[in-house]
């Protein structure tokens, strides 16, 4: 009940039928992020695509200019020199057959997964485990690569993977409530720009249809798409 009352109070002053400029929406969200922890600021982008069709899938990775405020644990599937390269770059978990076995047993001690191309026949066995978690390495988003150092540093430095969900929505954390407003605006615009660049050939009509921002415990605020894409 207390949470319901808090959310109701947080919604005061927000016109749920209105589209706000991005900067105004961020200010409103930050003012209402009053939890004892540093809430994550999240963005939801509704796209004019049907991801059930292969030619309308949208996914990619973007480096947010101001980071995410979150420290990711990175796992790397690699052998030999590439394994050492991953460790030197700051990977938290590095392995080959041994790491595959751990993951198969349900021991997933990382948030982002990277693999060298030669490891994919092994890693492919983990599709049923990593796939539903959105963690399966994929060359299209740079997580199957020989540049393991670059991929690890990117994951640690604020790169965000995005993928359209069944309802045609992309959701991503773009920073913390403690971030300055202009830093959050920059991060959201960087994400939106990457989503636009990832527009599939099969998309018809208006691509970016709706945008909303929210905090972990707070209400959503609808945003004028034009102020995000400008």
Swiss-Prot record:
GO biological process: regulation of translation; translation
One term under GO cellular component: cytosolic large ribosomal subunit
Keywords, sorted A to Z: Repressor, Ribonucleoprotein, Ribosomal protein, RNA-binding, rRNA-binding, Translation regulation, tRNA-binding
Top-level taxon of origin: Bacteria
tRNA-binding among keywords: yes
Xref: PROSITE patterns: RIBOSOMAL_L1
Cysteines paired by S-S bonds: none
Statement: the UniProt record of this protein carries the keyword Transport: no
Gene Ontology terms for molecular function: rRNA binding; structural constituent of ribosome; tRNA binding
InterPro entries: Ribosom_uL1_bac-type, Ribosomal_uL1, Ribosomal_uL1-like, Ribosomal_uL1/biogenesis, Ribosomal_uL1_3-a/b-sand, Ribosomal_uL1_CS
Function comment: Binds directly to 23S rRNA. The L1 stalk is quite mobile in the ribosome, and is involved in E site tRNA release.
SUBUNIT field: Part of the 50S ribosomal subunit.
Family statement: Belongs to the universal ribosomal protein uL1 family.
Stated name of the protein: Large ribosomal subunit protein uL1
Taxonomic lineage from the root: Bacteria, Pseudomonadati, Pseudomonadota, Alphaproteobacteria, Hyphomicrobiales
Gene name per UniProt: rplA
């Amino acid at each position: 009940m207390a949470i319901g009352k808090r959310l109701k109070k947080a919604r005061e002053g927000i016109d749920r039928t209105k589209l706000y400029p991005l900067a105004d929406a961020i200010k409103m969200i930050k003012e209402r992020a009053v939890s004892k922890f540093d809430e994550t600021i999240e963005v939801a982008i509704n796209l004019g695509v049907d991801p059930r069709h292969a030619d309308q899938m949208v996914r990619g990775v973007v480096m947010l200019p101001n980071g995410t405020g979150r420290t990711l644990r990175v796992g790397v599937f690699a052998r030999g020199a590439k394994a050492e390269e991953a460790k030197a770059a700051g990977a938290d978990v590095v392995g080959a057959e041994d790491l595959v076995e751990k993951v198969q047993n349900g021991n997933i001690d990382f948030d982002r997964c990277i693999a060298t191309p030669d490891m994919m026949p092994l890693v492919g066995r983990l599709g049923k485990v990593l796939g539903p978690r959105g963690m399966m390495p994929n060359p299209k988003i740079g997580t199957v690569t020989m540049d393991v150092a670059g991929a690890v540093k990117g994951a640690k430095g604020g790169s965000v993977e995005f993928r359209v969900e069944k309802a045609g929505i992309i959701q991503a954390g773009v920073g913390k409530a403690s971030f300055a407003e202009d830093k959050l605006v920059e991060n959201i615009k960087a994400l939106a720009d990457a989503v636009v660049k990832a527009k599939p050939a099969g998309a018809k009509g208006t691509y970016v249809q709706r945008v909303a921002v929210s905090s972990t415990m707070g209400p959503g605020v609808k945003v004028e798409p034009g102020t995000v894409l400008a």
